[in-house]
Amino acid sequence: MSRKLPALLALSATVSLALAGCSGSTDSASTSAASDAASTSVSQASSVTIEDNHGSVEVSLPVQRAASTDNRTFEVLADWGVPLVAAPKQLVPSSITAYDGDDVADIGNHREPDLEALAAAEPDLVIVGQRFSDQYDSIAELTPDAALLDLEPRDGESFDAELERQVTALGQVFGKEAEADQLIADFEDALERAKNAYDGSSTVMAVIVSGGEIGYSGPTTGRTWGPLFDLLGLEPALEVEGSTDDHQGDDVSVEQIAESNPDWILVMDRDAAITADEPDYTPAADVIAGNAALQNVTAVTSEQIVYAPDDTYTNESIITYTEILNSIADAFEGAQN
């Protein structure tokens, strides 16, 4: 599938040089200026072809009115100074304020999307993904003149390569190739650190704390943590048949988690990202500390618990995973000393 933005108007200029009485240096400067102008014109009229989850997408450059529905992109784009004309503001991590203004149209959330607001923002590029992946066809229908990019990590593909694929494509689209390369280098360094720090035998349990409850995040499939079991070669303390990527974790009893007696527990505090300002919010650390069934678990008694950044649930960008991997590496390295 290929969708192309309307061709940009090419700016042409005619430069007349008065050769008589001009010095050689003036000729050189004029030639250089004309060359620069031509180069700029070509750049402004160029395009880039990106291979996304639906095929080849041609994006005209420079992008003037980008919109994004993919949570994995917000921190990256904000750090790069990329403005957006529309975003699902309820889903933008609270740690990111670049898209809070009235100049950014609010397109609701994945449960109650306001795609008409997206269309009214007249984007020339829409980045579709994560919670809005199912809205791809509707978005395509309502924004026929926009290029659509869907870079959601694909099932069956290596998760690290998928994160890198996304940030590489964003770098190409927004002229931030060097910045994208640096994010990838930082991510790969963190991944290697965590791999090298793991002793290869300690058992690991991953959980999601939501609403004061502790949910199980299984190897491979579990939300946030699942792919890291494969990337780092972690030994699961417990494997449950039919585990899912449920946003609150799978319903496995805390007693069953405790009986598996993990050496390490990886924790994602879902509520920290969405309800931390509410009076009944209880931090994940307090939930775990207050759960009687877990108090004799090795990970608890040895204080071998790693917490994901507070905004992980609404972020999950390559930057978030770099932070998570470095935290895991720090913890594993500390346990060896």
Where are these regions (language model features)?
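A short, structured surface patch at a secondary-structure boundary
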Residues: Q64-R65, D70-A117, A121, L125
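Ligand-binding pocket segment of bilobal, Venus flytrap-like solute-binding proteins
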Residues: Y198, G211-S217, L234, D245-T275
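Bacterial Sec-exported substrate-binding components of ABC uptake systems
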Residues: S2-T14, A18-N71, A178-V207, M268-Y281, ...
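Short helix-initiation/N-cap motifs at beta->coil->alpha
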Residues: D52-H54, I107-D114, S243-V252
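Structured C-terminal subdomain patch of bacterial secreted/periplasmic proteins
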Residues: D263-N337
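Proline-aspartate-enriched helix->loop->beta-strand connector
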Residues: E122-V128, P144, I257, N261-L266
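Alpha-helical, coiled-coil/dimerization segments enriched in small aliphatic residues
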Residues: V92-S95, G218-Q248, D311
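Extracytoplasmic substrate-binding proteins
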Residues: S56, Q135, P144-G212, Q304, ...
